Structure formats: C-alpha cells, structure tokens
Amino acid sequence: MTPVVLGAGAYRYEVHDAWAKLPPGREFNADVAAVGVDAQDRVYAFNRGRHPMVVLDRDGTFLRSWGEGVFHRPHGVHVAPDDTLWLTDDGDHTVRHCTLDGKVLLTLGIPGSPKPYMSGEPFHRCTHTALSPRDDLYVSDG
C-alpha cells in the first residue's frame, strides 16, 4: 500500500495510522483535540475519550493516561518551557495548569460555570493558551 504523504517541498509528512500502540481495550474512541510534546519527546494526546490525556513515547508506545473525571471536553494543550501543561477544556470552561503526570497545579475559571457570552469574564468555551517570553498567559476564549 502506498503511504499517504501530505505537504510539499521540505515540509512533507507521512501518515502513520498505526503509530500509537495502545494497550488492549484502549482506543482513541473520540477526537484527539490537541497534541503536545515535552522536552523528553513524550507525546501528550488530549482527547475526548474515556482517558482524556494519553501519554506516548516518541515511537508511539503507551506510557500512561490521566485526567479521568477532571476534563469534560478537552480542547487545547500547550507544553510550557518548564515542562508543565496548560490545558483548556471548552466544555468545562476552564484552563488547568498541570504537571506532566496530571497533578493539577492551578485551575482558572469555575468548572461547569460558563460566563455570559462576550462578557470578558473567564470563561465561555476557552480554547487555547499561549505564554509570552515574560511568562504572561494569554487565553483564547470561544
């Protein structure tokens, strides 16, 4: 079978459908909304399945999962320079700052309490985060 290649020129990428090697009974049964990669080349697949965060090594081997009961509708992942994760949940209207093993360090927003649309109060379907070089956090909201 001919591999699927996307892109052009120096930016060509080959699709590897079977790259993720999940344990028996585990599967991505919902959207993988975002991915991030830490300094050790571990891949964080933030998904809308039963195990919201699936951690894989660079070869796709399953390492662990976490976030069950914490996340409602995962949306964005940002790996910070200090190897922590900023995770947005647009269904729960929160941003969570977590360690790489899932310990929640900080929650921004009130879980399950959306603010009025366009009110400017955190949050109404927050989507992504970005950190400035001075460590200012920016959040896109819905």
Sequence positions of predicted segments:
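Eukaryotic scaffold repeat domains enriched in small/polar residues
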Residues: 1-142
